[in-house]
């Protein structure tokens, strides 16, 4: 027997075919969210308050400091927040200190700074009652970038950019005459030496001594019209502020504020880390030949002689000396923007491949401290030196798509940036108030206006592109949404601008971003998913784990290192499936490995690291596809994406053929209930589980406190599916930390169960499975195999209007008693009622304007002393195509002190309607390999082809769907699934390390089946065997969220667009079907003139004709001739508005009067076809 039995959770054993042992547990899959938010609460907020403190007034007398903060208890708990449509948030209280310097008085106060949304344990936020996810954003990291470009004459040129986290950009470039220019903040360019002079290197000689003589520098100095620091400063000021009178002081303060003011310019810790890495000597001298010795600055001894070529080993030896600033020089810069001395390191090296033996200077930035978040003059000089070195062939250009140059902004940082915006707006208000208020009676509370802070947080959660309504179709969709990485959003790319290179798979994605899971369509490659083992480091770079190789013994150690993409570029990494002996040594002399972008074979001695697992390349969703290695990547992409659209079924079932990821994905998704502590189950019922903690002290175990776990029962998920949790533990069970206590939707016994295992045959049947269509047995309908539960929410609110309050009541004008049969005495539908479209759910009347009374009404009024109530019916009705059973009704009243109602609303009623949807013709089904299709026919069980033992098969798929799509994984799954079913076992075939052909065939033989996996099938209609043996097996098939019930739509009359008077489009607007250009051609080709005329007039925008036609149909008369369509009139008006004289003539050249039909004409005919005229903005967009 191939494979070994592995336990997944408490309830499931699987036969696992993996050959590579797991050396590292999968991390918690949503820690990217939870860790980042924890960092924000612990450090991020504090950092913000530190940055902004102190706020001083213009005279410097008052100073306001933020000392400390704390989060209080949330007003509503999680469940209550969801029920009340509230935000799950805790009050943020900040300790503020006000110092009055004149008197030395200090006032301290705790100030409330708004409610701060809290993250749930499962990595989501509840905002206005709905669960939302903050997606992590992939952005370009702040750093110094150099890139190569070819100009129009085919010459190689370079440009450089210093990109901060916030602040002005600094760019260097060369032109056709080999002059080097600088641009400050995207303005006009200046010769580079102007900026150097402004920094205090004032004479030509100083500049040449600093950067080393080169042709480019000489050309630039010739072009430079300034001669000293003052002139350079004025020149820069004129460029940045044209039209303003330049003075040296103004120029200095402008340059200071652009680059050296920490409030305006911020490299962030990540920018400082990247700049030091790029500009320091230790990374730039690799493989260079020294033109001067390297001297230890402390002892004065020569560490490396002139003429030495520095290879990796040599560099490692002198690393400490380089870091203690060998060959460093300190410049005292006169008249510069910054008064402090500038320290730089410079070493002369020989220009590579130069016959004349010229030298060039390599200047490093002398490693400013990581606390220095601004750019320093040393950074600017070192970046210029790097640029000149590049022109001499020393150094590397950067690849912007490399993950070493792209970083993640997760929840914490995104929130911090948003909070910073709010605080800086608040800072302005505080300053203004300081100058107005009386200093004696002033308190911190009076100075602080928290509105801008609250507004910026609200804006972020409510309307940011990265704050998204959680995709809750099933647990996998939830999990993937939390692990999504988006390159879109504020400060990121836009769809239109994103080039092919940004979207493409890059070698640095290996183990960090999934190369498979990305949307099809305009966002392809811009939205990605985090790989299964990846994690994010403190700087926001994605790291992936590798097993360290001991270089002395050449064996794999137990040490696991997490490497970022640019660290990995220095190492050779062996694949996870390299053969090892029991001591961890490589068995083969030549090992398949990766070095940067190359997959190659190298000697085993060259290996530095080894992959942790074969599935570290792919994301959680992709890792759920068995036999992924046998599928074409395009289909695997569809498979990974479609699993997220699977609808939770009423009776879910875990796959016979899994990958072992099902348990982990279910546990971490947040849909299951997991134990927070080790304990013993004391009580289990359908809606709650009680667990007594077991605490270990001094080696003995004793009972601790009791934990309550409430279960969600038949709730509506964000996607309108049924969210239900079922306990899977029993009283007395001892559960471990993080063990699953209750299954969520689409789960069975602690494993993800998105679909069902069904018996599938690859065969055609009367052409019904043409073009990927699916033929299904009626058994699957009858036995509720693919039945799902859907819950819709409808709400109605009674508001105050100008004419009086709306009222929720059973007393509705002009409605029969039968229409009110489901309403209780309040006028609200009762729970359990069965409703269909058009039925009233909530009776509501709205006051109408008072009209002139008729004689009869006046008489009634005189007799009974009351005016007949003037109200119109605005009841909430079931929309078209909906209906079902009323599951729940929630009523919120203002009288009962419900402060969550929005202003002007007196009463709010929410009605939940549940539908049980069996599977239909027209529903979309798919497997896990991107094999999707629509059900074309549901065949009675007795007519389905049956196996030799008489069992009819469940589904027939077209064999032509396999070869051209190249997703052979489905065929292997089919065979292995049949064997697993016959053996009564579940199997796991992990990605890239699963069952191979031999394993599949041997398992098939073990199950007593024919080795080719084929069988004789008999036609259910005739009882005859089919001509050839057919592949029949068990495949895991899912029902997708694209259901025909949601798409079916019909209209006779309905709303029309306001200007063109054509019917609206789309089901949501109750629109019509657009009869477009090509359809018109079809009728023209047939010569169907009258049909065409009626489609373009009565059925579209002939306003008079359609009213008359409706009348004629009702009265049974002949239909009159059509009149002029409204869109023709719109065209005429359009031309007339351009000043053209447009008239319509008949065949006798008589002008035809184009009378406007107004609403009164239509009203006379007593037929209002325009049930509601929609604004022009809703005009049809569908074709």
UniProtKB/Swiss-Prot annotation:
Bias type Acidic residues, positions: 1151-1162
Q: What is its EC number?
A: 2.7.7.6
Q: Which GO terms describe its molecular function?
A: DNA binding; DNA-directed RNA polymerase activity; ribonucleoside binding
CDD domains cross-referenced by the UniProt entry: RNA_pol_B_RPB2 (cd00653)
Q: What class of enzyme is it?
A: transferase
Per the record, what are the reactions this protein catalyses?
RNA(n) + a ribonucleoside 5'-triphosphate = RNA(n+1) + diphosphate
Q: Which InterPro entries match?
A: DNA-dir_RNA_pol_bsu_external_1 (IPR019462), DNA-dir_RNA_pol_su2 (IPR015712), DNA-dir_RNAP_su2_dom (IPR007120), DNA-dir_RNAP_su2_hyb_sf (IPR037033), RNA_pol_bsu_bac (IPR010243), RNA_pol_bsu_CS (IPR007121), RNA_pol_bsu_protrusion (IPR007644), RNA_pol_Rpb2_2 (IPR007642)
One GO biological process term is: DNA-templated transcription
Q: Does the keyword Transcription apply?
A: yes
Superkingdom to which the source organism belongs? Bacteria
Q: Which Pfam families match?
A: RNA_pol_Rpb2_1 (PF04563), RNA_pol_Rpb2_2 (PF04561), RNA_pol_Rpb2_3 (PF04565), RNA_pol_Rpb2_45 (PF10385), RNA_pol_Rpb2_6 (PF00562), RNA_pol_Rpb2_7 (PF04560)
The record, for Gene3D superfamilies, names: 2.40.50.100, 2.40.50.150, 3.90.1100.10, DNA-directed RNA polymerase, subunit 2, domain 6, RNA polymerase alpha subunit dimerisation domain, RNA polymerase Rpb2, domain 2
Query: GO CC annotation: what is one?
Result: DNA-directed RNA polymerase complex
Give the protein's biological function. Answer: DNA-dependent RNA polymerase catalyzes the transcription of DNA into RNA using the four ribonucleoside triphosphates as substrates.
State the PANTHER family in the record.
DNA-DIRECTED RNA POLYMERASE I SUBUNIT 2
User: Which family is this protein grouped under?
Assistant: Belongs to the RNA polymerase beta chain family.
Checking NCBIfam families in the record gives: PRK00405.1 (NF001616), rpoB (TIGR02013)
What's the protein name?
DNA-directed RNA polymerase subunit beta
User: What organism is listed for this UniProt entry?
Assistant: Staphylococcus epidermidis (strain ATCC 35984 / DSM 28319 / BCRC 17069 / CCUG 31568 / BM 3577 / RP62A)
Supply the gene name: rpoB
């Amino acid at each position: 027997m191939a494979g070994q039995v592995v336990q997944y959770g408490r309830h499931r054993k699987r036969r696992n075919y993996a050959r590579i042992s797991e050396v590292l547990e999968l991390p918690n899959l949503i820690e990217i969210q939870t860790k980042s938010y924890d960092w924000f609460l612990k450090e991020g907020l504090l950092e913000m308050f530190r940055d902004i403190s102190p706020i001083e007034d213009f005279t410097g007398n008052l100073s306001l400091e933020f000392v400390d903060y704390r989060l209080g208890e949330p007003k509503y708990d999680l469940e209550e927040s969801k029920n009340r449509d509230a935000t799950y948030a805790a009050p943020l209280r900040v300790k503020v200190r006000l110092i009055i310097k004149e008197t030395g008085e200090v006032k301290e106060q705790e100030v409330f700074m708004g409610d701060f949304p809290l993250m749930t344990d499962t990595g989501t936020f509840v905002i206005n009652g709905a669960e939302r996810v903050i997606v992590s954003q992939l952005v370009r990291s702040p750093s110094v970038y150099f890139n190569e470009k070819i100009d129009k004459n085919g010459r190689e040129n370079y440009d450089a950019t210093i990109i901060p986290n916030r602040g002005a950009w600094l760019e260097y470039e060369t032109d056709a005459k080999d002059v080097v220019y600088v641009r400050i903040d995207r303005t006009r360019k200046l010769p580079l030496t102007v900026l150097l002079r402004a920094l205090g290197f004032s004479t030509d000689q100083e500049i040449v001594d600093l950067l080393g003589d080169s042709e480019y520098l000489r050309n630039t100095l010739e072009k430079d019209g300034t001669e000293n620091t003052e002139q350079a400063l004025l020149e820069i000021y004129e460029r940045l502020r044209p039209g303003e009178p330049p003075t040296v002081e103004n120029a200095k303060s402008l340059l200071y504020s652009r680059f050296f003011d920490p409030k305006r310019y911020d490299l962030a810790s990540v920018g400082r880390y990247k700049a030091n890495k790029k500009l320091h000597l230790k990374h730039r001298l690799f493989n260079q030949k020294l033109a001067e010795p390297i001297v230890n600055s402390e002892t004065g001894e020569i560490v490396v002689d002139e003429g030495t070529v520095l290879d990796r080993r040599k560099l490692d030896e002198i690393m400490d000396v380089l870091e203690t600033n060998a060959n460093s020089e300190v410049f005292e810069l006169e008249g510069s923007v910054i008064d402090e001395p500038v320290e730089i390191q410079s070493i002369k090296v020989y220009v590579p491949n130069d016959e004349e033996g010229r030298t060039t200077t390599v200047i490093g930035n002398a490693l400013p401290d990581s606390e220095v978040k601004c750019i320093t003059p040393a950074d600017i000089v070192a970046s210029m030196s790097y640029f000149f070195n590049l022109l001499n062939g020393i150094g590397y250009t950067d690849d912007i798509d490399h993950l070493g140059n792209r970083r993640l902004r997760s929840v914490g940082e995104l929130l911090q940036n948003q909070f910073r915006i709010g605080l800086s707006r608040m800072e302005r208000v505080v300053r203004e108030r300081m100058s107005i208020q009386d200093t004696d009676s002033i308190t911190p509370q009076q100075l602080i206006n928290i509105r801008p802070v609250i507004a910026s947080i609200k804006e972020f959660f409510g309307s940011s592109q990265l704050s998204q309504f959680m995709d809750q179709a099933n647990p996998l969709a939830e999990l993937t949404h939390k692990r999504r990485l988006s390159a879109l959003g504020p400060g990121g790319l836009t769809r239109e601008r994103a080039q092919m290179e940004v979207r493409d798979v890059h070698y640095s994605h290996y183990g960090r971003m999934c190369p498979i899971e990305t949307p099809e369509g305009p966002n392809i490659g811009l939205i990605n998913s985090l790989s299964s083992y990846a994690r994010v480091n403190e700087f926001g770079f994605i790291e992936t784990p590798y097993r360290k190789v001991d270089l002395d013994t050449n064996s794999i150690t137990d040490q696991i290192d997490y490497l970022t993409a640019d660290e990995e570029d220095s190492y050779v990494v062996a694949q996870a499936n390299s053969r090892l002996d029991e001591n961890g040594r490589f068995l083969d002399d030549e090992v398949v490995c990766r070095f940067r972008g190359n997959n190659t074979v190298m000697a085993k001695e060259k290996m530095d690291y080894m992959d942790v697992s074969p599935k570290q390349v792919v994301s959680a969703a992709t890792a759920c596809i068995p036999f992924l290695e046998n599928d074409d990547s395009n289909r695997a992409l569809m498979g990974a994406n479609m699993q997220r659209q699977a609808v939770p079924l009423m009776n879910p079932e875990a796959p016979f053929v899994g990958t072992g990821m099902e348990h982990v994905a279910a546990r971490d998704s947040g849909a299951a209930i997991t134990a927070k502590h080790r304990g013993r189950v004391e009580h289990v019922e359908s809606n709650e589980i009680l667990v007594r903690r077991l605490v270990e002290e001094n080696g003995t175990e004793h009972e601790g406190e009791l934990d309550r776990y409430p279960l969600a029962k038949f709730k509506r998920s964000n996607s309108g599916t049924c969210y239900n949790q079922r306990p899977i533990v029993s009283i007395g069970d001892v559960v471990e930390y993080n063990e699953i206590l209750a299954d969520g939707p689409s789960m069975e016994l602690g494993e993800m169960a998105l679909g069902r295992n069904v018996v599938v045959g690859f065969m055609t049947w009367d052409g019904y499975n043409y073009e990927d269509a699916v033929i299904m047995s009626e058994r699957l309908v009858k036995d509720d195999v693919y039945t799902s539960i859907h819950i819709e929410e409808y709400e109605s609110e009674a508001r105050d209007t100008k004419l009086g309050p709306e009222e929720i009541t059973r007393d509705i004008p002009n409605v029969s008693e039968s229409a009110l049969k489901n309403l209780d005495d309040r006028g609200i539908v009762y729970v359990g009622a069965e409703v269909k479209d058009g039925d009233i759910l909530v009776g509501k009347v709205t006051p109408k304007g008072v009209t002139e009374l008729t004689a009869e009404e006046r008489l009634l009024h005189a007799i009974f002393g009351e005016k007949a109530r003037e109200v119109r019916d605005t009841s909430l009705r079931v929309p078209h195509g909906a209906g079902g059973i009323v599951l729940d009704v929630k009523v919120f009243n203002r009288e009962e002190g419900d402060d969550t109602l929005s202003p002007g609303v007196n009463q709010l009623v929410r009605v939940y309607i549940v539908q049980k949807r069996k599977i239909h013709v027209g529903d979309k089904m798919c497997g896990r390999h991107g094999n999707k299709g629509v059900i074309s026919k549901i065949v009675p069980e007795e007519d389905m082809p049956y196996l030799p033992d008489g069992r009819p098969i469940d589904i027939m798929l077209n064999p032509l769907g396999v070869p051209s799509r190249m997703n052979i994984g489905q065929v292997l799954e089919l065979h292995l699934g049949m064997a697993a079913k016959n053996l009564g076992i579940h199997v796991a075939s992990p990605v890239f390390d699963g069952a191979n052909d031999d394993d599949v065939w041997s398992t098939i033989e073990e199950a007593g089946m024919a080795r080719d996996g084929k069988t004789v099938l008999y036609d259910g209609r005739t009882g005859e065997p089919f001509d050839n043996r057919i592949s029949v097996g068990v495949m895991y098939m899912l029902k997708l969220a694209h259901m025909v019930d949601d798409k079916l739509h019909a209209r006779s009359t309905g709303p029309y667009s306001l200007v063109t008077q054509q019917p609206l489009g789309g089901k949501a607007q109750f629109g019509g079907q657009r009869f477009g250009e090509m359809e018109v051609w079809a009728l023209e080709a047939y010569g169907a003139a009258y049909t065409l005329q009626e489609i373009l007039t009565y059925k579209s925008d002939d306003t008079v004709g359609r009213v008359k036609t409706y009348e004629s149909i009702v009265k049974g008369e002949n239909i009159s001739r059509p009149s002029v369509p409204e869109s023709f009139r719109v065209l005429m008006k359009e031309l007339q508005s351009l000043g053209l004289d447009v008239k319509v003539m008949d065949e006798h050249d008589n002008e035809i009067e184009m009378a406007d039909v107004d609403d009164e004409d239509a009203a006379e005919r007593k037929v209002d076809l325009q049930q509601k005229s929609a604004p022009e903005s809703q005009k049809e967009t569908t074709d």
